[in-house]
Amino acid sequence: MLISEDIKLDYSDVLIRPKRSTLTSRYDVDMTRTFNFVHSGRTWSGVPIMASNMDTVGTPKMYERLLEHNMITCPARHYMKKDATWWRVGTTDNKMLGKNVCMMGGIDEIGHMVTHHLKWEFIGIDVANGYTISVIDAIKDIRLRVPEATIVAGNVVTADMTQELILAGADIVKVGVGPGSVCTTRTKTGIGYPQLSAVIECADALMD
């Protein structure tokens, strides 16, 4: 057993210190960024914020609002199952939707969806424990079947596994185990990692 003695921080542990600015209004702030994804070969420009695929977050209304600001929405799973509009996003007969949508699911779910719909720009593998070999295998499988897709995979909280997912073919890594206010992973299993430290360490791993 290894006990880490380093200080680990959650977002609630820190504040953002203000500094001198030449901006005259908050409306002058431009958060647009451009990303070149290594594996998919795609270039994406927008505000790098993703709405989670949680039940009350990844909704059609959320998608409409975030699309106005060029942000990304991950539809909640129950929408993909019951709502044909979401389910058919990215297919050739429904081109109105599909921009800035990341279709996410578990290993079996996303494998089934990819079989029937190959036109999605973003495809996400979302499991509670991203440390299993099955996640690596799923990334490699989807990368082989849809090489032009930008793949999101997780969840992990450490640098070593972040690198493993990227090497397997993921373009974006989903970071976090148990940080949510309604998530019971930490209280029931004792497994987790302070979220701010997880994000910093996983991001640093990609700079090596």
Map each language-model feature to its residues.
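Active-site entrance/lid segments in N-terminal catalytic domains of soluble metabolic enzymes
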Residues: 1-208
